[in-house]
C-alpha cells in the first residue's frame, strides 16, 4: 500500500521532473516579483493598491485565488472524501456570498474609498467615512486585521508545510520555510502589482488542476460509472443531508456572510480601474469559483473509489489531491498539479501579508509619523510596508511551527472573525447615513469578541446542545448588527456631509 510519507515520497523522489516543474513555478513567481519591483514608483498607494489601475480579469482571478487558498484544493476534497456531498453546503454558501458581494459591496466600495480621502485600507476608509479624528476606529479595526490575519496567514503556511511533507516526504519545517521564502520575496519587493499578477497566474493553474484531476481519475476508474461505484461503497456519501442537522446546514451555508468583510478580497474591488469594469470581473470570477469548487467536490467523490482501487492507505484526507495527482499523472504533470496546490496556498498568503502590512503602515506607522510625513516621505513608508511583510510572516511562521488543527478549522476561525467584525460595518458604511463612530466601534468590537468567546467557551458545549455548535460567524454577525444599529441610534447623528457623499456614491455607481 502507498502511504503518504513512505512509498509515495519514494515515487516522487525518483521523478526529478516533478522537482523541475516546481522550480520553474517558483522561478516564474520570482520574475513576477522582480517585475513588480521595477514598476514600483516609491509611492505607498502604488505598493499597497497598485495605483487603482488593475483590470477586470486580473481583479477577478486574483480575488478568487486569494479567497480559495489551500482549502479548495486540500481542505474541501478531504471533507467531501470523509463526509460526502453534505460538505457542498459550504460551497453553495460561498458561491452565493461571493456573487452578492460583487453587487452589494464592490461598486460602492470602489467609488466610496476613492471619494473618502482616497483610502487604501479598510480602517482608513472607516476613519474617513465616519470622520474619526481621534483614530479610535482606525486603530481598533487595524488591530483586528493584524490579529486575525496573522492567524489566517499561519494556516496557509501550515498547508505549505503539509504539502512538502506529504508529497515529497520532506521535513514539514523545510516546506514551511521554502514556501515562506518565495511568498515573502515577491510580496516584499513587488507589492500589490506583483501579488495581483501572481494571483492571476495562480488562479489559472488552480482552475486547470481542478478540472484535470477528477476527469482523469474517472477515466482511469469507471468513467461516469465511478459515481455508481461510490454510491455502492458509501451510499450515504451522496446524500446532501448526511449527518447534518438544521444547525449544521445553516452553519455551513453561513460562510457566505463573511465575504462582505474579508479585507484581502474586497481590497481587489478597491484597486480595479473603474467600477464599470466590475460586471466583467464578476462574470469571470464567479464562473472560475463555481467550476473550481465543483472540481474540488468531484476530487473528493472520485477519491472514495480511487483510494481502494489503487490500494492506497490515506492517512490524512486533506492530502487526497496530492496522492491522486502523483499516482495518475506523468511526473511533469504531477509537478504542475503540485504547483497548483502551492498556487492556492501562496496566493492567499501573499494577499494577507500585504493587507496586514498595509494596515501596520497606513493605520499605525502613519499615526506615529503624521500625515505630512506620509506625503513627503513616501519611500520611507514603502520600506516600512516591506518590513511589515517580513515581520508578520515571521510571526505567522512561528505559530505554524507546531500545527495542531485542520486547515478548514484554522480558516474557519479567521473567516468568522472578519465576517462578524467587518461585514456588518462595511454594509452599514456603504448604505446607512445613520451610522456613527460609536456605533461602528461598538459593533465591530462586539462582533469580534462574540467570535472569540464562541470558539473558546461556547463551542465546547456542543455535546450538551447542538445550538452551541453553531458556526461562530452567525452569532457574531447578529450581535454586531444589533449593537451597531442600537448604539448609532443612541449617539449623536453624523454630519450632513455623510448623506451628501452617500448620494454621490449612489449616483456614480448608477452611471453606465
UniProtKB/Swiss-Prot annotation:
Name of the coding gene: putP
Residues that span the membrane, as ranges: 16-36, 54-74, 85-105, 139-159, 174-194, 200-220, 247-267, 286-306, 327-347, 381-401, 410-430, 438-458, 467-487
Chief place where the protein resides: membrane
Alphabetical GO biological process terms: proline transport
Keyword Ion transport: yes
Keywords: Amino-acid transport, Cell membrane, Ion transport, Membrane, Sodium, Sodium transport, Symport, Transmembrane, Transmembrane helix, Transport
Protein family (similarity comment): Belongs to the sodium:solute symporter (SSF) (TC 2.A.21) family.
GO cellular component: plasma membrane
Annotated protein name in UniProt: Sodium/proline symporter
Pfam family, one: SSF
Lineage: Bacteria, Bacillati, Bacillota, Bacilli, Bacillales
GO molecular function, a single term: L-proline transmembrane transporter activity
NCBIfam families: Na_Pro_sym (TIGR02121), sss (TIGR00813)
Annotated membrane topology: Multi-pass membrane protein
Amino acid at each position: 500500500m502507498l502511504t503518504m510519507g513512505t512509498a509515495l515520497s519514494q515515487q516522487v523522489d525518483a521523478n526529478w521532473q516533478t522537482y523541475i516543474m516546481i522550480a520553474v513555478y517558483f522561478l516564474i513567481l520570482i520574475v513576477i516579483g522582480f517585475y513588480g519591483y521595477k514598476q514600483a514608483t516609491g509611492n505607498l498607494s502604488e505598493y499597497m493598491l497598485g495605483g487603482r489601475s488593475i483590470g477586470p480579469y486580473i481583479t477577478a482571478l486574483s480575488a478568487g485565488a486569494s479567497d480559495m487558498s489551500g482549502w479548495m484544493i486540500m481542505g474541501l476534497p478531504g471533507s467531501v472524501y470523509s463526509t460526502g456531498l453534505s460538505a457542498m453546503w459550504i460551497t453553495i454558501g460561498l458561491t452565493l456570498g461571493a456573487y452578492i458581494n460583487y453587487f452589494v459591496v464592490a461598486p460602492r466600495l470602489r467609488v466610496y474609498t476613492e471619494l473618502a480621502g482616497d483610502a487604501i485600507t479598510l480602517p482608513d476608509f472607516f476613519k474617513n467615512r465616519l470622520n474619526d479624528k481621534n483614530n479610535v476606529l482606525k486603530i481598533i479595526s487595524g488591530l483586528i486585521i493584524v490579529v486575525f490575519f496573522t492567524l489566517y496567514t499561519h494556516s496557509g503556511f501550515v498547508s505549505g508545510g503539509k504539502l512538502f511533507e506529504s508529497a515529497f516526504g520532506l521535513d514539514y519545517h523545510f516546506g514551511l520555510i521554502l514556501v515562506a521564502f518565495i511568498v515573502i520575496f515577491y510580496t516584499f519587493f513587488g507589492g500589490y502589482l506583483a501579488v495581483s499578477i501572481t494571483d492571476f497566474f495562480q488562479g489559472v493553474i488552480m482552475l486547470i488542476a481542478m478540472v484535470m484531476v477528477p476527469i482523469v481519475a474517472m477515466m482511469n476508474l469507471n468513467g461516469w460509472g465511478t459515481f455508481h461505484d461510490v454510491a455502492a461503497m458509501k451510499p450515504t456519501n451522496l446524500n446532501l443531508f448526511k449527518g447534518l442537522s438544521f444547525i449544521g446546514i445553516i452553519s455551513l451555508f453561513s460562510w457566505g456572510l463573511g465575504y462582505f468583510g474579508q479585507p484581502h478580497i474586497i481590497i481587489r474591488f478597491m484597486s480595479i480601474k473603474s467600477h464599470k469594469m466590475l460586471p466583467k470581473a464578476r462574470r469571470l470570477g464567479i464562473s472560475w469559483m463555481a467550476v473550481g469548487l465543483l472540481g474540488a467536490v468531484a476530487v473528493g467523490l472520485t477519491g472514495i473509489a480511487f483510494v481502494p482501487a489503487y490500494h492506497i492507505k490515506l492517512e490524512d484526507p486533506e492530502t487526497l489531491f496530492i496522492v491522486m495527482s502523483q499516482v495518475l499523472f506523468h511526473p511533469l504533470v504531477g509537478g504542475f498539479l503540485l504547483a497548483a496546490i502551492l498556487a492556492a496556498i501562496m496566493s492567499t498568503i501573499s494577499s494577507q501579508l500585504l493587507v496586514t502590512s498595509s494596515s501596520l503602515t497606513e493605520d499605525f506607522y502613519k499615526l506615529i509619523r503624521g500625515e505630512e510625513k506620509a506625503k513627503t516621505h513616501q519611500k520611507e513608508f514603502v520600506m516600512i510596508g516591506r518590513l511589515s511583510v517580513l515581520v508578520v510572516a515571521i510571526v505567522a511562521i512561528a505559530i505554524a511551527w507546531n500545527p495542531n488543527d485542520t486547515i478548514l478549522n484554522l480558516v474557519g476561525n479567521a473567516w468568522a472573525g472578519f465576517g462578524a467584525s467587518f461585514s456588518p460595518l462595511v454594509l452599514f458604511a456603504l448604505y446607512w447615513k445613520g451610522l456613527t463612530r460609536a456605533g461602528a466601534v461598538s459593533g465591530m468590537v462586539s462582533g469580534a469578541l462574540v467570535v472569540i468567546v464562541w470558539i473558546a467557551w461556547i463551542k465546547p458545549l456542543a455535546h450538551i446542545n447542538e445550538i452551541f455548535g453553531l458556526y461562530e460567524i452567525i452569532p457574531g454577525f447578529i450581535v454586531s448588527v444589533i449593537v451597531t444599529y442600537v448604539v448609532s441610534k443612541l449617539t449623536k447623528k453624523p454630519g450632513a456631509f455623510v448623506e451628501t457623499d452617500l448620494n454621490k456614491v449612489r449616483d456614480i455607481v448608477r452611471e453606465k
